[in-house]
Amino acid sequence: GAMSSADFGYVLFKEFLNFDPDNPDWFDRDRFVLSAGHESMLLYSLLTLAGFLNMDDLKEFRQWGSRTPGHPEHDMTPGVEATTGPLGQGVAMACGMATAEAHLRGKLGSDICSHFTYALASDGDMQEPVAYGSAALAGQWGLGRLIVFFDSNKIQLAGPTDRSDCTDYPQLYRSLCWQVIEIDGHDHGQIREAIKKAKKEENKPTLIIGHTTMASGSATLEGSEATHGSPFSPEEIKASKEKIGLPAEEEFFLPSEAITDFQSRFPELRERASAWKDRFKKTMDNSPELLKYWEKIHAAPEDRQISWPDFDPEKPLATRKAFGSCLNHILDQVPNLMGGSADLDPSNQTVHFRNECGIFNGDNPCGRYLPFGVREFPMGGILNGLALHGGIVPLGATFLVFSDYERNAIRMSALQKLPVLHVFTHDSFYVGEDGPTHQPVEHANALRTIPNLNVFRPADANETKKCMHIALTQRETPSALLFTRQGLPVLTRENYPRLEEGVDRGAYILREADGPVELILLASGSEMHLALKAAEILDKKVRVISVPCMEIFDAQPEDYRRELLPEDVSARFAVEAGDDTAWYKYVGTSGKVFGLNHFGASAPAGVLAEKYGFTAEKLARFIKDNLK
């Protein structure tokens, strides 16, 4: 892997990659994504030659607290653009970065934004459907500044690729509207010419297929899958060094002349970065509107000032429709909001977004709407790439039941601390007639198990806009926003004065008991209205708690959590139209949860609610029976 890709990596970094040697975060740098994250030592070696890492960092490879973890992590190592390792996703994130570059070039002009995105992919990357789906979109969108090097050594962890793959990649990628160039991946002259040709193609992304040899340069293991994940023996290391012409006894060896040669282009790179700063100042001095846009897209998320629509308390509204109204309301206020739906525009309420902001493609780079097609996982990876690039607020939508398709990209949003908005509508069995394949059961709680992910399930339109505000003001936490298909009553500030401040804290008392609290009933989303009605039926003093976001509530000071859930009230119940496991941390082992721990069925939503007991009367009966 790392040895078969080394020639491409070396030529790219030494001769082509545009970056500021003194500032790895310079806005107009080229991006390089190592999709083949298991080849991390190649990237670390190149970053050492570039001066971002040092020899001590290399000696700490894969050790606790080092800047050289086993797979690259973008927030840990300067010069690492994306956290990679799960194969294929680096290609998706590179596609997202190239999309961001093309869009911002259209908005800011090429004097301010004009760079390339490179990715290095392995045989395993290319086999992952997420790479294929992203490549299809890159071709559709005409991302001419996306260049992927395919290290085709025809070996993967378990053996030769021909045991499991008969894909004709040149033909496949040509059919996806890519330029394809095939070369000897070890010939520096061919690599050089391929990159030059790729950079000249303005309307198509380029796939450079480098035919390479696994473990190229090793003494006896060239072409062997044994080298994929296992270190060389001491004897093989010694013999390989002798073959290449390196001092056999030196464990780590980097002569100063190698650094000098590698960095020979640095004066030119510094000059380019300096010239960009001059252009930037001149452009912004002469264009107040452009400066305003720049400041807005680079403002800290927590400083965003956003106004939201008002909702008619007399008209029930599905939270997905409330989301749609909120989205439409903020399009001008958040001018760098970019994203779309996985072919569910009407259902996800993104049609106005599409029509108002225009579809992004090569002919319309200023368009902000991304029609992802039925590609949930590529969508998630591309959203991460948009966020990693910077200057973009990414949003993607689909049905909650299909969050499983997108799950690992959502996990990578959380791991990389990217404030992506993952929107999921049709959040329970109330989907109705489409049946169990489209009715989420375990999905909300499955998302809640992902660290550093806020999962919002608002109870009405007003909680929805508050949840969206929180999501849009996060610096390092992505959000999963879960919305209903069915209409829900609108909770008003007059009747529920704690609502706005309460959502900020993840959970709050929506209805207080009349007197000393005898029973606590927790709920989220559509079941909040069920809980309010059941509380009226019960002949107990009931406190009803709305829990739109468990993660935010769990992070509150202990005093606030005890205030809502006093220890002396053991009669605790929760209701949610889905798997019940997450709620026991609130109700305790003596409490009960009214949930849904089985698959749904095809029938009208009202019929299913009756059959499954999701009525106020049956919830009240469940509580009474369990109090006995």
Model-predicted regions and their roles:
Residues 1-116, 264-266, 270-482, 487, ...:
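Thiamine diphosphate
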Residues 27-28, 206-218, 222-301:
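Terminal amphipathic helices with adjacent charged low-complexity linkers/tails
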Residues 35, 122-123, 186, 375, ...:
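Structured loop/turn residues at secondary-structure junctions
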Residues 83-84, 121-124, 179-184, 225, ...:
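Flexible, glycine/proline-enriched loop segments at strand-loop-helix junctions
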Residues 119, 149-152, 423-425:
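Short beta-strands and strand-loop turn motifs
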Residues 120-121, 149, 209, 341:
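Generic enzyme active-site microenvironment
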Residues 124-130:
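Short acidic, Gly/Ser-rich segments with clustered Asp/Glu that frequently serve as metal-coordination loops
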